[in-house]
Amino acid sequence: IHRYWEEKQGRKRKKVLLSVLFAISGLICWCGISQVISNSVTASFKNAFDIPPMYTTIVLVVIAAVIVLRKNATVKVLDLLVPVMAVLYFVITLFIIFTNLGSMPGVFKRIFEEAFGFRQAVAGGFGVVLMNGVKRGLFSNEAGSGSAPCAAAAAECDSPVKAGFVQALGVFVDTIVICSCTAMIMLLAPEDLVQGLSGMELLQTAMHYHMGQFGVIFIAATLFMFSFSTFLGILFYARGNVAYLFGDNWGSQTGYKVLALVMLFIGGIAAYTFVWDLGDV
């Protein structure tokens, strides 16, 4: 990506402003995402197993350190985790939908009424929904945050068109499929049961209604795989940006990995609202 912009500007050996800004912005963005990841994992394990966030955070950081400090381990772990977690989550959601088919019309009615209703429009509800959708959409896929080209640039394929189609499919799977699965799980639970809840507590309470304690544990395990694979992925992206800015040497590469682990630790023990507000910024 950086080389493309340098060639575009006719300066192959000099760093141009746009490529430098891209690299810096990416690193800042990924630091925020690291905190959101660990915070979600610790919250889910607290709800499922009543484990204090500090203990979960320490274990998470240790596991991450063992993996990221080993050369070429990132992609190998991702190749194993991502397909398994996506399929399992999708299958469980289909089971919940099929066991609650009678409630589906009411779910879709509620979605459209609360998003586009007259009361919501007058009260500014549509703008709030749109704003939250944009902010959370940045975390559901990478097209909005601008980091998707990092994955496309590293892909090995015989045509850029194929790479583009794969990236488009990734947005569809992440946002339309996976996020819709989460929405169905929560909306198919009784409204009075989840009233006033948010974050992991909301999702796991809804899953407990559908599948009992197994559902709560399943969400914790699945979220761990989702979050951990995302963390490893952003480290893979950050590696190229760090190498571009500071050189591909042991000091710079180790430094950014240590910083990522520190952010992972801070996010795990920080308050939910603080982490998400920082991530939104």
Model-derived segments and spans:
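Select transmembrane alpha-helical segments in multipass membrane proteins
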Residues: G10-I28, I58-V59, Q120-S140, V177-S180, ...
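Extracellular/periplasmic helix-exit of transmembrane alpha-helices
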Residues: L94-R110, G124, A154-C157, L169-M200
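Helix-loop junctions at the membrane interface of multi-pass solute transporters
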Residues: H2-R3, G26, A65-V66, G137-P160, ...
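A generic transmembrane alpha-helix motif of multi-pass inner-membrane proteins
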Residues: S252-V281
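Flexible loop linkers connecting adjacent transmembrane helices
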Residues: I1-K12, D192-M211, G240-F246
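Helix-loop-helix module between adjacent transmembrane segments
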Residues: H2-I67, A221-L232, D248-G251, I266
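Small-residue-rich segments of transmembrane alpha-helices in multi-pass membrane proteins
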Residues: V82-F95, T175-C179, Q253-L264
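Membrane-interface loop-to-helix entry segments
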Residues: L18, F22, G26, N39-F45, ...
